[in-house]
């Protein structure tokens, strides 16, 4: 299976250095953070016996928060906008810039390994809406068709603070500002809802759009996991779509912990656990996401 891989332009480099005593623990070293690219050169001057180490992390690709650009077919409810290589995040003026920056960084890094998947999602118009911490889900215009009565408004405002694809738009995902920023009123504490909801778009729009056999592969893994007794009593067994999104959360160390399983979650909430518990799914996810 041939895939286009991505060589990133920029990285965050954390340099750990000590010019005198190399026997120190790394966390005790002098540290410095740099933004570098593949052509950068770093000069180090170390005394005899000195030591250093470097950690490289992908640097998100994004612009700055602006008003809605002219020519964009975006509802007038939205006043803020930020973009990462064609994918955009938007919100009303009541949402902090910090939340939009965080959302943009997340989607940039999630797609950093597969530019072909990202390009297809850009072509389809994929985007993210952030629900303000003081806004209700039904305030967003995309939800008007399901928030069309007092009962439905009350239900959806209670039911969820984020969706991936349906019911609003198969090319959009949404999440709450309070979850992005881990604010006290977050009802999903311990999880990152954007990673879950955006994983649905990556799956259903991006990957399936460039790999027509992907859903067959995913369904086979989902059925096999169920037959092995994996994910019993969790949301991941609902269908192949939730299996993918829940496992992506665990891959990125942002799923909620429950032991025993509580009908939604179990104890497999982190990457190292997922790798040991469901190695075939872990292997699949590595095709699309950096470890």
Which residues fall in each region the model found?
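C-terminal beta-strand-rich structural cap/linker in extracellular carbohydrate-active enzymes
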Residues: 34-60
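Acidic/His-rich structured neighborhood in mature extracellular/periplasmic domains
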Residues: 74-77, 84-87, 92, 96-223, ...
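Pan-zinc metallopeptidase signature
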Residues: 248-291
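Post-HExxH zinc-binding segment in Zn-dependent metallohydrolases
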Residues: 205-257
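N-terminal low-complexity, Pro/Thr/Ser-rich intrinsically disordered segments
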Residues: 61-85
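Short, small-residue-biased leader/transition segments that mark boundaries at the very start
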Residues: 2-7
